[in-house]
């Protein structure tokens, strides 16, 4: 913020004409005698912490006014003091807050924002009558006083013991996934080793799933047909999961106007990692989650207690986060991503806690379905935890009984976010680092900020809202799946995706030309049964065809020669049951193969293979 403070005999103004960002006001003219006139330009940096810049500006104005023994203050917006202006919405709020704070001890006149104004001023002309000041968002000692402190515990749900984490506890931990998550939370750095790229980065390129798009911004991907199929199947999976549990799908914009106070305040809580830009005189942002559109939609709804809990779901395609370039890592951390996002409106905390528990189990189910085990951490403010210990311990006990695992508990001394409780579930990658995926959060702020109300008789109640991503971003889910596939190789298992997610579930390879007609019949039977099957008709050796099927992670490789045609039994290599150098082969009829694959994919979403059936016709994308 830039300010120009003038000790004035008087300041007089008249608002002449509106601009596009003019505030609504009845104060179109005014005059104040014997005053301190404060010309103010709100800058972009002020948006990172509006409360701090208001506090610091008020302190500076009070100090100057007291030195000059002045009791009258004019707050005058003056954009010409800076070439790096903040958004109009931020400026209006900051100026209004400054006026409000000063009004406790001074007579204050504030000129309207966003109007062309004429003004007359008489400067007293003494050595302290003209002062310029740059106001920053520095909080000085206040930050230290208000710092929220965390304590971490290991919770054994069966015994319901809480053990505070220390070096001895860390040294004794046997659950490697939970230990990796705990070290990440405690910011314990491992000894530096030459690791290179995570395995999933190699896989996404080698398997023609996706790749960096060099002509876009860093952290944006192009998706090839196989990758698009996987992403669509994952999206279908989450859609079915939430709709079965009462979620109502919606779609909202990806771009929002920061002049809306609620939008800006919610965006500011996320910090600087946003795509923001100015277009047509408006300060705009690209969403980093579906909160904005869903909250604006809920604000316009006429909600009654009987409607609750009310769940709105959106597959946020895309969401954007301006991560630092040096932090961008494959599908784990990127700038444009697909986020399944459900928000649940709850009447009160009791209903919110019931929904939280339901959504915890829903999130854990996704790990079961993907075969990617999670480590989990609960996070609660001290007050919330003290009030709801019995509920938490019952939930932790059920988790231990179902999964046989301990969990981490973080207790925060106060609230530093919009939530009072949350749970995060993480896959651990091949480098021993967590990939946080599903999350559930109890939000106690946003309903009031966005004006969301429930009509309960004559009362209007601000509800509690749960944020839930049942899987985390689709890209991170795939990241976890691929990292888990690599970890399988360390246990002498071939890397693979779950059958329902594998682009090519079955490949039929004829030994010779005379076997092609029968092989095509088999392929067509598989495809007509909803199985993604292709046919390797390339002019290559049998050995290379089988190796290619392995490279493509085909779940079932069917070889057809004389004996298969004569017996009607197919020789099938089953990838999931094989070892790295010891393929597991079975003799199955076409019907038995169809039944085997169908049993593995029962209840899972299905889509056809988006590639030509014949391998010779499938293009190479990279």
From Swiss-Prot:
Zn(2+) binds at residues 291, 343, 467. Gene3D superfamilies: Anticodon-binding domain, Bira Bifunctional Protein, Domain 2, D-tyrosyl-tRNA(Tyr) deacylase. Its EC number is 6.1.1.3. It is an enzyme of class 6 (ligase). Keywords: Aminoacyl-tRNA synthetase, ATP-binding, Cytoplasm, Ligase, Metal-binding, Nucleotide-binding, Protein biosynthesis, RNA-binding, tRNA-binding, Zinc. The N-terminal domain is an archaea-specific tRNA-editing domain that hydrolyzes incorrectly charged L-seryl-tRNA(Thr). Catalysis of tRNA editing is performed by the charged tRNA itself. PANTHER family: THREONINE--TRNA LIGASE, CHLOROPLASTIC_MITOCHONDRIAL 2, THREONINE-TRNA LIGASE. Catalyzes the attachment of threonine to tRNA(Thr) in a two-step reaction: L-threonine is first activated by ATP to form Thr-AMP and then transferred to the acceptor end of tRNA(Thr). Also edits incorrectly charged L-seryl-tRNA(Thr). This is Threonine--tRNA ligase. The lineage of its organism: Archaea, Methanobacteriati, Methanobacteriota, Methanomada group, Methanococci.
